[in-house]
C-alpha cells in the first residue's frame, strides 16, 4: 500500500497516476512536435507549412460568419479547450485537492508568486525603455506541466511523489496567474453586443448549475455559444474555457453522502475487513487505489463483501469532463499547438539574436528568474513559518524542482503570440523560450538525478 507517500494530505492515488501518465507522455509528444516544427521550418517544406497555417477556415450560418486562418483556429479555438482543462484542474484542486486548505496551498502559492515576480522583473529590466518589447513582460512567468512532468518521468522512483505534487501545484497556480494576466493585459478593444451575449450565456450556465444539471451536453452547447461571443467581443476567446469551467458541477467535501461513505470506508480499513478485492489509500475524498489485475483503471466501484464503496468521481461531472479532455489535450491539442507555434528559422541565425534584449529577457527570466524566485520566496516563507518543504524532500531536490519550473514552452509561447504581432519579435521569443526550456529541463534532470535516491514503495 502506498498510503503514506504523500504525508498526511493524500491526493487521489489512481487519478494522480493517470494524470502523471498522460501529462508525461504528452510532454514527450510535445517535444517531438516542437522538433518537427523546427525541422519543417528549416526545410524545403517551409512554404507548405506556412500555406497550411494560413489557410482560411470559414464557418458561416446565414449572415453570421467566423473567418480565421488555421493557425488562429488552433490558438483561439483548440487552446480554449486547453484552458478549460487547466481551469477544471484548478477548480478540483481548490475544492478538495492540494489547494483546498491554507496548509496545502501555502508552499505552492508562495513559490509560484516568486516564480512570477522575479522572471518578470528580469525581463522588464532588460527591456526597459522599449515600449513594444515591454509588452512581453509576462512571457517568462509560466511553467509547462507536461514538459516538466515528462522530465520527472525519466527519473522514475528517484523523485518523491510529494515533489511531483508540489511541481503540479506550482504549475497550476502559474496557469491561473497566466489566465488572469491574459484577461487583464492582453485584451483589445471591446464590442458591447457580443459582450451582452456572453453575459447571457453566463446566466444560463449559472442556471444550469443551480438546477443541479449533471449532464455535460447543455454546458458544452452553451459553452460553445459563449466562446463565439467572447471571440467576437474582443476578449481573448480562450477565456471562454475558463468561464465554463467555473460552472461545471463538482461535489465537495461537505456532501453528506460522501461523509457517510467516508465513515464506512475508514472503518473497513481500520478493522481489516477488506476482502482483498482492493487495497490502497482512502482519504477524505474517498478514493481507492485498485490493485486487482481483473479490475481496469477506470473502475469506480469496489465490492468489499461488506458494503459497496463508490467514489465521488463516478457521479462528478467535473471529473468526467476533465478525464475525457485529458487525452485529447495531451495527444492532439498541445502537439498541434507546438507544431503551429514552435517553428524557428535557423537561416542566417547568429549570436546577435541571442543577445537581443527580448531573447535575453525571456531566456534569463525562465532559466534564472524562475529558480531564483521559487527558491527565494520558499526560503522566506519557511523562515517566517508560512510553509514547509514537502514530505521526504530535501533542499537540493527542491532546487531541482525550481529548475524544472523554468520550462515555460506552451503558455510562454502562447503569451508571446498575444504580446507581439511582429514576426521578428516572435522569433526572438521562440528562441528564448525553447533555449531556456531545454536548458532548464536538462539542468533540472541532472540536479534531481544526482540528489535523488530510490524511493521504495511498500
Where are these regions (language model features)?
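Predominantly late transmembrane helices and immediately cytosolic-facing juxtamembrane segments
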Residues: 12-15, 22, 215-222, 229, ...
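Transmembrane alpha-helix boundary signature
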Residues: 40-51, 68-71, 85-101, 119-138
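C-terminal ends of transmembrane helices
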Residues: 13-17, 85-100, 149-160, 203-214, ...
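Functional cores that coordinate and move charged inorganic groups
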Residues: 152-266
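Hydrophobic transmembrane alpha-helices of secondary-active transporters
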Residues: 63, 67-96, 247, 328-349, ...
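Hydrophobic core segments of alpha-helical transmembrane domains in multi-pass membrane transport
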Residues: 29-42, 82-88, 118-120, 201-207, ...
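Structural signature of hydrophobic alpha-helical transmembrane segments
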Residues: 72-83, 131-146, 187-200, 236-238, ...
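Entry/N-cap segments of selected transmembrane alpha helices
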Residues: 93-121, 191-200, 347-372, 433-437
Amino acid at each position: 500500500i502506498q498510503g503514506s507517500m504523500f504525508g498526511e494530505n493524500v491526493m487521489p492515488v489512481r487519478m494522480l497516476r493517470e494524470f502523471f501518465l498522460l501529462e508525461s507522455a504528452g510532454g514527450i509528444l510535445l517535444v517531438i512536435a516542437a522538433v518537427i516544427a523546427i525541422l519543417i521550418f528549416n526545410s524545403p517544406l517551409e512554404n507548405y507549412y506556412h500555406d497550411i497555417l494560413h489557410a482560411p477556415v470559414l464557418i458561416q450560418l446565414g449572415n453570421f460568419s467566423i473567418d480565421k486562418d488555421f493557425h488562429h483556429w488552433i490558438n483561439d479555438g483548440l487552446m480554449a479547450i486547453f484552458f478549460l482543462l487547466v481551469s477544471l484542474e484548478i477548480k478540483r484542486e481548490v475544492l478538495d485537492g492540494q489547494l483546498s486548505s491554507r496548509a496545502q496551498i501555502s508552499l505552492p502559492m508562495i513559490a509560484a508568486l516568486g516564480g512570477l515576480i522575479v522572471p518578470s522583473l528580469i525581463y522588464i529590466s532588460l527591456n526597459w525603455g522599449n515600449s513594444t518589447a515591454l509588452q512581453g513582460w509576462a512571457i517568462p512567468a509560466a511553467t509547462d506541466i507536461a514538459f516538466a512532468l515528462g522530465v520527472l518521468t525519466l527519473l522514475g522512483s528517484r523523485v518523491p511523489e510529494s515533489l511531483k505534487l508540489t511541481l503540479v501545484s506550482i504549475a497550476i497556480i502559474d496557469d491561473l496567474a497566466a489566465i488572469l494576466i491574459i484577461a487583464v493585459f492582453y485584451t483589445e478593444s471591446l464590442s458591447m453586443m457580443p459582450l451582452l451575449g456572453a453575459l447571457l450565456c453566463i446566466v444560463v450556465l449559472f442556471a444550469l448549475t443551480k438546477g443541479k444539471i449533471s449532464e455535460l451536453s447543455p454546458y458544452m452547447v452553451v459553452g460553445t455559444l459563449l466562446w463565439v461571443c467572447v471571440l467576437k467581443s474582443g476578449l481573448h476567446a480562450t477565456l471562454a474555457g475558463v468561464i465554463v469551467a467555473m460552472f461545471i458541477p463538482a461535489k465537495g467535501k461537505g456532501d453528506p453522502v460522501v461523509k457517510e461513505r467516508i465513515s464506512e470506508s475508514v472503518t473497513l480499513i481500520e478493522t481489516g475487513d477488506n476482502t482483498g478485492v482492493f487495497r490502497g489509500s482512502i482519504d477524505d475524498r474517498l478514493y481507492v487505489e485498485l490493485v486487482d489485475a481483473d479490475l481496469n483503471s477506470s473502475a469506480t466501484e469496489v465490492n468489499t463483501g461488506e458494503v459497496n464503496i463508490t467514489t465521488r468521481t463516478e457521479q462528478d461531472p467535473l471529473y468526467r469532463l476533465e478525464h475525457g479532455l485529458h487525452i485529447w489535450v495531451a495527444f492532439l491539442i498541445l502537439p498541434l499547438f507546438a507544431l503551429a507555434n514552435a517553428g524557428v528559422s535557423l537561416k542566417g541565425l547568429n549570436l546577435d539574436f541571442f543577445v537581443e534584449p527580448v531573447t535575453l529577457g525571456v531566456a534569463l527570466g525562465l532559466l534564472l528568474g524562475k529558480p531564483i524566485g521559487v527558491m527565494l520566496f520558499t526560503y522566506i516563507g519557511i523562515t517566517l513559518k508560512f510553509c514547509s518543504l514537502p514530505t521526504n524532500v530535501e533542499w537540493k531536490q527542491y532546487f531541482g524542482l525550481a529548475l524544472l519550473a523554468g520550462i515555460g514552452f506552451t503558455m510562454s509561447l502562447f503569451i508571446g503570440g498575444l504580446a507581439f504581432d511582429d514576426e521578428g519579435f516572435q522569433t526572438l521569443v521562440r528562441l528564448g523560450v525553447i533555449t531556456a526550456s531545454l536548458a532548464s529541463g536538462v539542468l533540472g534532470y541532472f540536479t534531481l538525478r544526482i540528489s535523488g535516491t530510490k524511493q521504495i514503495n511498500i
